Amino acid sequence: MGRFVKVDLEYGERPLADVLDAVERLAARPHDGIFLNRAPGDRAGLGGVALAVRVAHRVGFELVLLNPGRPVDPGYRALGAAICVFDGDWAEYQRWSGEGAAPGDGHLVHGVPAAQAENARKMMEWRGAGFGLVAETRTW
């Protein structure tokens, strides 16, 4: 797994100027990409997220990961960013229907006992996840 710098979008509650400043400032750090955590996924948040993604690309982030943690409005699919459509615990992931996910989307699953890690990875594969993370604790 690469080195990602992280910016918390606070589901659209963080002022956009603060988000953009953080994106520009973090571009100077060694990185393989940027993780825009707790991104809004609804139509109302699309404009601010689109601007953050454009700025991230402009300042040198080739890989942008959006983490709304749930399925998104279709407009997000055109932003040129990878999207995590699941961010939750292992019990929730096992119950999740996968509705709203597209092949290649990301899945972040925490609370996975070590003995269940391989099962969680297989479940991600069956659900068409393009990338993901299985962890015992939530570290992101």
Regions inferred by a protein language model and the residue ranges of each:
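Glycan-processing catalytic domains of CAZymes
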Residues: M1-W140
